[in-house]
Amino acid sequence: MAKNAKFRVPFRRRREGKTDFRQRLGLLLSGKPRLVARKSLNNVIAQLMAYDEKGDVVLVSAHSRELVKMGYKGHCGNLPAAYLTGLLLGKKAVKEGAEEAILDKGLHRATKGAAIFAVLKGALDAGMDIPHGDEIIADEERLNGTHVKNYAESLKEDADAYKKQFSKYLEKGLNPEDLPEHVEELKEKILNL
């Protein structure tokens, strides 16, 4: 604890492991809205944030649960869901007139093909202008769910393991082998909003 004048207590959000203030300052100095992408185990959240002295303001937001309302039957925490969430956010942002942004990955490590960069790719495909490097974004096969399809086909021989792994897909009426077509169908639906 703070016992004398030499000890400096870090900001509360830094102590809690929520904010990297050096990175945040760099993003705010750009003067552009921030594309904030966050992933949990079962959901993906994307927001377009603008700075305000009283606190950041959310300009546009998209949640992977919105995809379910649009007819998405896959898992809301996987890579195709992250891509579609970014696409939905980008479409809403372009409609609102916010076509330029900068990616705010927060405390997430920049790993090639991560869900945060799938959100970025979705926003780019919707027509937003966000500075990025192409090598960090996952392949198209992973963004549309072909890797899930390939895994389902390899697991098809063991019926019990297949049913256990893909029980929610089957419960919702979607064969995991049909996921790429389902993602493309939903992509067209979002682009035509």
Swiss-Prot record:
InterPro entries for this protein: Rbsml_uL18_euk
Tell me the gene name. Answer: rpl18
NCBIfam families recorded: PRK08569.1
Q: Which UniProt keywords apply?
A: Ribonucleoprotein, Ribosomal protein, RNA-binding, rRNA-binding
Query: What family is this protein classified in?
Result: Belongs to the universal ribosomal protein uL18 family.
Q: Output one GO BP term.
A: translation
Q: State the function annotated in the UniProt record.
A: This is one of the proteins that bind and probably mediate the attachment of the 5S RNA into the large ribosomal subunit, where it forms part of the central protuberance.
Tell me the PANTHER family matching this sequence: LARGE RIBOSOMAL SUBUNIT PROTEIN UL18 (PTHR23410:SF12), RIBOSOMAL PROTEIN L5-RELATED (PTHR23410)
Record GO cellular component, one term:
cytosolic large ribosomal subunit
Quaternary structure, from the entry: Part of the 50S ribosomal subunit. Contacts the 5S and 23S rRNAs.
Q: Which Gene3D superfamilies match?
A: 3.30.420.100
User: Pfam family example for this protein?
Assistant: Ribosomal_L5e
Task: Quote the SUPFAM superfamilies the UniProt record gives.
Answer: Translational machinery components (SSF53137)
The name under which this protein is listed is Large ribosomal subunit protein uL18
Which GO molecular function annotations are given, in alphabetical order? 5S rRNA binding; structural constituent of ribosome
